[in-house]
Design a protein with these regions (language model features):
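Active-site loop immediately N-terminal to the catalytic Tyr-X3-Lys motif
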Residues: 37, 87-91
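Alpha-helical segment proximal to the catalytic Tyr-Lys
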Residues: 64, 109-112
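Residue(s) in the substrate-gating loop at a strand-loop-helix junction
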Residues: 80
């Protein structure tokens, strides 16, 4: 979530590899979890700065470096199934991941004629350490949000689903496969397809 740090990463990558052809914007914190009225500005700002602005800075810094050599490249933004269809108590997380999906769609159209492909990865539950992100929350983002009993139950259930999710290596292989096939949307959990079909059907019906 720091533009200067992204510039340092770019400098290190150029020093090591000479050119940059691909960037994977992978950042995710849960933000405050709970009812709308319990989520304060600091929790929202944390999610916005990491989940959204981290992606923005990554593309802003790296895209000119990919354009510079004229050989084309790829930007992969990591969103979430939550960014396609939000769940309860996860307002900040779902909003920022939805923004990543929308940004990816925008950038894909913008960069296509520059030879730069854009893809957006939307996984569901994966065995990551996202629930440990709270301990790394900087002091300036510490909030006073109170946890409700319902929220605590929801948090515990989502942690269990993360712990029982697919392995990261499976996601990695899926991404490689998708890039080889030139896919824009990258999904890792086929069992969510019916949920997406239902959502899309509701949207289609609203246009009638």
């Amino acid at each position: 979530a720091d533009e200067a740090q992204w510039q340092e990463v770019a400098n290190q990558a150029l020093a090591r590899f000479g050119k940059i052809h691909m960037v994977v914007n992978n950042a995710g914190v849960g933000g405050d979890i709970g009812p709308i009225e319990n989520q304060d500005k600091k929790g929202w700002q944390w999610a916005l700065d990491v989940n959204l602005m981290g992606v923005v800075y990554g593309a802003k810094i790296m895209t000119p470096l990919i354009k510079e050599h004229g050989e084309g490249g790829w930007i992969v933004n990591v969103a979430s199934m939550a960014g396609i269809g939000g769940g309860p108590y996860l307002g900040a997380y779902t909003a920022t991941k939805a923004a990543v999906v929308a940004l990816s769609e925008s950038w894909a159209g913008e960069l296509e004629d520059k030879g730069i492909h854009v893809s957006v990865l939307c996984p569901a539950f994966v065995q990551t350490r996202i629930h440990e992100s709270e301990r790394n929350r900087p002091a300036k983002y510490k909030s006073g949000s109170a946890h409700t009993p319902d929220e605590g139950s929801f948090t515990n259930s989502t942690k269990q689903m993360v712990d029982n999710g697919i392995e990261v290596s499976i996601v990695g292989r899926r991404v490689v496969e998708a890039l080889e096939d030139g896919e824009f949307y990258i999904f890792t959990h086929p069992n969510y397809h019916p949920v997406m079909q239902e959502r899309n059907a509701a949207i289609d019906a609203a246009f009638i």
